[in-house]
């Protein structure tokens, strides 16, 4: 038994978190107060990255941090992944400039290619097809529109909906404000490159 104890459950898999706490079939149903966290401010990242690089005798251009922050819309995991790679690419007493970003991006995608292929291997053909279409368009509004379906040679609105359902459930694709996108920025770029 616990008294005067608070628990914090956190995670970026929104579907899973919602299911745990807001599904009547789950034991934690309506037992929490939900709070969404907003992105850490860009200035905080600029200061933090500059300090971390400097502590190890390296430097990073403020503009490089701004570019990375905007690429990932303030999403911490992706920013940290990119900053870690940029740090590894930067020699001691050197300055990491925006030119390093493409190299870091390519390195991350190459390092994760096996994971991306495993995801694709586990998808049905129609799921792959809709995933490729989303990757090409990046942010998709009107995913069941005839224009989107024709442009990507998809079968029908109902087949798009059927293929999309498991992609959403597994957080491979997310819907933000009526726009669909691939959740993992690196996976999205990988798909756009190869297909």
Where are the predicted features?
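Sensor-1/coupling segment of RecA-like P-loop NTPase cores
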Residues: 1-25
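Amphipathic alpha-helical "lid/sensor" segments that cap RecA-like P-loop NTPase cores
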Residues: 46, 50-115, 125
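Short glycine/proline- and charge-enriched loop/turn segments
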Residues: 24-32
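C-terminal leucine-rich, beta-strand-based interaction scaffolds used for sensing/assembly
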Residues: 114-195
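Conserved AAA+ ATPase "SRH/arginine-finger" region at the nucleotide-binding site
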Residues: 33-44
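Short, flexible helix/strand-to-coil boundary loops that buttress conserved ligand/catalytic motifs
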Residues: 20-21, 49, 83, 177, ...
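Non-catalytic, well-ordered alpha-helical scaffold segments
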Residues: 11, 66, 76-80, 84, ...
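Conserved RecA-like P-loop NTPase ATPase core
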Residues: 37, 68, 130
């Amino acid at each position: 038994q616990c008294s005067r104890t608070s628990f914090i459950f956190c995670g970026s898999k929104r579907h899973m978190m919602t299911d745990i706490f807001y599904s009547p079939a789950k034991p934690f149903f309506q037992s929490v107060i939900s709070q969404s966290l907003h992105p850490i401010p860009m200035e905080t990242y600029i200061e933090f990255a500059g300090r971390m690089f400097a502590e190890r005798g390296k430097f990073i251009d403020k503009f490089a941090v701004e570019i990375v922050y905007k690429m990932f819309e303030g999403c911490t995991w992706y920013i940290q992944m990119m900053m870690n790679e940029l740090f590894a690419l930067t020699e001691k007493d050197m300055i990491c400039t925006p030119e390093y970003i493409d190299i870091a991006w390519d390195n991350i995608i190459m390092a994760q290619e096996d994971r991306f292929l495993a995801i694709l291997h586990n998808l049905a053909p129609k799921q792959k097809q809709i995933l490729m279409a989303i990757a090409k368009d990046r942010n998709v509004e009107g995913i069941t529109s005839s224009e989107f379906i024709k442009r990507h040679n998809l079968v029908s609105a109902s087949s798009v909906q059927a293929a999309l359902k498991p992609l959403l459930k597994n957080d491979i694709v997310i819907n933000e404000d009526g726009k669909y996108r691939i959740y993992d920025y690196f996976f999205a770029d990988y798909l756009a490159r190869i297909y």
